């Protein structure tokens, strides 16, 4: 992989950037011990265990057994959407072999909590490192992902020595479920845009007693991280993103002047590829409720909608299971099913279009690290990144796509260690 770093004091911005195409742009370390209030009050932090009722799982299996798949033109693959043969195989595995209880037990091996913020119960994992001086790190997922994307990197981040790393690179890890996702409550009012979600996460970290912390994310997690860095700059040690946002520099007659040809070609290639993968944006950004009636009622439909994105946004040669196992895919999909959150999670696209931020996020002064994966859904040239962020760390990855933590955990963990090492 290519890797470049510059001292922060030089304020030198070096970056390759991933462009957010969702249209929602309108949209050093101090480590305090967490203070978890044990009394019954509005700020109480409560332990939480995942325990899906048996009847929910029985109903899921009954629905899977009654699946009615549509026809498919013979000889077609994934260009019309989710491939029927693969979906049928996935459904059979889901019904006959996938063990949610086994996955539930693994997930419950981590410390889960809930706390009320902004009128919502917010679910999160909180794993503290035993290493003195560990940096608190907020990991934020996007759509159609969830907190489960990050569970395989908790160990390497909190206990690097156990995974062949340097204990000095340790982190305390906080992984929330965004409002409307997973085991967090669903907002019951309009306007829950990325800004509002960033406020919730800032309140969560404050409640845990972390005065300063790092943030990492992709997809909506990157968007929310940018808002955090803009509105809570004094709290962030550093911002790491595998989905860096950035538009053309303002006031420049020719925004492509001086941009390397290779970057322009890569941006065009990514834009062409994503043009065939972006129908969901319009649906979820305009009529998420209508879509939800189908996806919340049919597990096969839900699986088809989600697995299409994992297939289209990841780095593989046609074999999806060369990068994700069926269990990984189905744990995430089942989480959406048992919590009935596919509709509430999709509404962020609608809200980001219709609820403008109340605070303008300008240039990000917080030191920013970028991990550029070759099969990310879009790409932004260097000059655009320089106009948006104080990027002090840039890594061009040899492989990987949109779901970096799940697809290439070792690469992401290594880059997080490298980036934050210069900020300790």
Regions found by a protein language model. Give the residues of each.
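Glycine-rich "HGGG/HGxG" loop immediately N-terminal to the catalytic nucleophile
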Residues: 100-102, 165, 178-192, 226
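Conserved hydrolase catalytic core segment
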Residues: 156, 160-163, 211-259
């Amino acid at each position: 992989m290519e890797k470049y770093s510059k001292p922060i004091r030089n304020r030198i911005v070096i970056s390759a950037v991933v462009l957010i195409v969702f249209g929602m742009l309108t949209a050093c370390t101090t480590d305090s011990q967490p203070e978890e209030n044990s009394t019954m009050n509005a700020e109480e932090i409560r332990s939480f265990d995942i325990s899906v009722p048996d009847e929910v799982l029985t109903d899921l299996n009954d629905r899977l057994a009654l699946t009615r798949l549509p026809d498919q033109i013979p000889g077609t693959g994934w260009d019309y959407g989710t491939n029927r043969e693969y979906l049928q195989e996935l459904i059979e595995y889901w019904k006959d072999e996938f063990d949610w209880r086994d996955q539930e037990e693994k997930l419950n091996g981590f410390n889960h909590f809930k706390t009320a913020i902004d009128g919502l119960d917010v679910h999160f994992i909180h794993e503290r490192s035993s290493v003195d001086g560990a940096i608190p790190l907020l990991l934020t997922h996007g759509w159609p992902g969830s907190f489960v994307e990050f569970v395989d990197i908790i160990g390497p981040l909190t206990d690097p020595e156990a995974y062949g790393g340097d204990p000095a690179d340790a982190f305390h890890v906080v992984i929330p479920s965004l409002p409307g996702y997973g085991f967090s409550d669903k907002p019951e009012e309009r306007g829950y845009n990325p800004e509002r979600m960033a406020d919730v996460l800032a309140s969560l970290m404050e409640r845990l007693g972390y005065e300063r912390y790092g943030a990492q994310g992709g997809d909506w997690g990157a968007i929310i991280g940018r808002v955090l860095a803009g509105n809570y700059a004094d709290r962030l040690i550093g911002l790491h993103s595998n989905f860096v946002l950035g538009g053309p520099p303002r006031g420049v007659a020719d925004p492509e002047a001086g941009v390397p040809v290779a970057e322009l070609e890569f941006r065009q290639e990514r834009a062409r590829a994503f043009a065939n993968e972006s129908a969901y944006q319009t649906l979820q950004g305009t009529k998420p409720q209508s879509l939800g009636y189908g996806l919340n009622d049919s597990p096969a439909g839900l699986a088809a909608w989600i697995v299409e994105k994992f297939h289209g946004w990841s780095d593989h040669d046609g074999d999806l299971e060369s990068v994700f196992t069926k269990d990984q895919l189905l744990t995430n999909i089942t989480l959406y099913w048992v919590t009935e959150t596919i509709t509430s999670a999709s509404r962020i696209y609608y809200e980001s279009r219709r609820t403008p931020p109340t605070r303008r996020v300008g240039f990000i002064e917080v030191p920013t690290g970028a991990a550029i994966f070759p099969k990310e859904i879009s790409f932004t040239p260097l000059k655009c990144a320089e106009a948006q962020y104080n990027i002090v760390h840039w890594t061009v990855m040899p492989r990987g796509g949109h779901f970096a933590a799940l697809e290439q955990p070792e690469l992401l963990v290594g880059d997080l260690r490298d980036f934050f090492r210069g900020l300790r």
